[in-house]
Amino acid sequence: MKFPGPLENQRLSSLLERAISREAQMWKVNVPKIPTNQNVSPSQRDEVIQWLAKLKYQFNLYPETFALASSLLDRFLATVKAHPKYLNCIAISCFFLAAKTVEEDEKIPVLKVLARDSFCGCSSSEILRMERIILDKLNWDLHTATPLDFLHIFHAIAVSARPQLLFSLPKLSPSQHLAVLTKQLLHCMACNQLLQFKGSMLALAMVSLEMEKLIPDWLPLTIELLQKAQMDSSQLIHCRELVAYHLSALQSALPLNSVYVYRPLKHTLVTCDKGAFKLHPSSVSGPDFSKDNSKPEVPVRGPAAFHLHLPAASGCKQTSAKRKVEEMEVDDFYDGIKRLYNEDNGPENVGSVCGTDLSRQEGHASPCPPLQPVSVM
């Protein structure tokens, strides 16, 4: 519930005070350990955090679940000396604890499914045993203030104090803008160099960098948030520099101008005398389907050429019963796609659609046709 004016500011200030107090009780200074075969190295920690981020998307869980799992993992590794061979089991146990703490009951993954689909290399019973060890070491206290909690609070205070903050981003609502910052924060949480800062410092540095891009008076608002959070300005400057470095590396790693091309199944559209389409095998290669459908298809980068070869109209030949059954199944498949995109036209439009597509293909000389929705009857 959002309160108007001063009441909203008081509520946000109260949330910030409680979160900072909670963080002060839980947070421990990160002491870098000498990498050996007997303890978890910083790079191994970053790899397992990135793995948890992938699990978050795989099981369609909240960002808060990943943030809490990451915080629990760091708290546990700061308390005990863990062997690297147990790291996956520790991480998946923290992930399961976070899911049970944050998610709704129907969204919590089934333990057997989680152990199987995550490829963690441990059984359900091993996860439960490790879960009990983690709870004992953390004194059964899982409710800690995560960097994502502080990001929500700082962003709400900034938007409330500076309503013009998002004027330069008219297409983004405050929640959409927060989602962009959340994605950046989750990336920074997988960087062990930022473990030297509290979660509140990390969130404020990210909000401050974003305000610097959007409004000219970002510095007074940053100082105001800094005073409310009772932080050291020199640490904030150092944290801003590291966050800016890691975010610049993230932007440079993104693919440029990625184009996702949809190719239909291995069939060609052929016109018939009655104004209907027939499906025949084509040399156009369609997508390869394997047993593992969980992996996304690799995007095609740069100019991509594809054609729908439409031979000249000819008389429709009598097909066998098996061919008719196959055509009915494919027609049902395409009917489902048309209904999904609200392109379910009546049969009277078949001839006009055919003529339009033929003229478009004949008149377009470029090997790369414009990316437009294609209606397949």
Curated annotation (Swiss-Prot):
SMART domains xref list: CYCLIN
Keywords, ordered alphabetically: Cyclin
Classification via Pfam families: Cyclin_N
An example molecular function term from Gene Ontology annotations: cyclin-dependent protein serine/threonine kinase regulator activity
Gene3D superfamilies: Cyclin-like
Composition skew (Pro residues), residue ranges: 367-377
GO biological process, any: regulation of cell cycle
Family: Belongs to the cyclin family.
Protein name (record): Cyclin-I
Organism: Mus musculus
